[in-house]
Amino acid sequence: MNELALFAGAGGGILGGKILGWQTVCAVEIDEHCRDVLVARQNDGCLNPFPIWSSDIREFDGRPWRGRVDVVSGGFPCQDISCAGTGTGLDGERSGLWSEMRRIIGEVRPRYVFIENSPML
């Protein structure tokens, strides 16, 4: 299955997908340190090569990936949801990015969606 990894972080979910036999075709991650880890894991062979979208997820267009992606995965920011966070929930600035994940899922229309997040959700 071809995966589009949103909020990819340092690639733990991508590695899990690789173990399941998924092929990541693109990752979206704004954090520079996380992107550096993704590149390092590609360079050392832990992860297969894939392009990394480094701009804000609000600028990512999922439509070109329609028909090319079987699963959209990701864990949108949970700081506003978790018990250690602000308590503003899905309306919070960071956790509100769930709506971008929803938008991209609608653009891509994958067969499957895999979301990881706080149990407080």
Question: How would you describe each model-predicted region?
Answer:
Residues M1-L121:
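Conserved active-site and SAM-binding loop architecture
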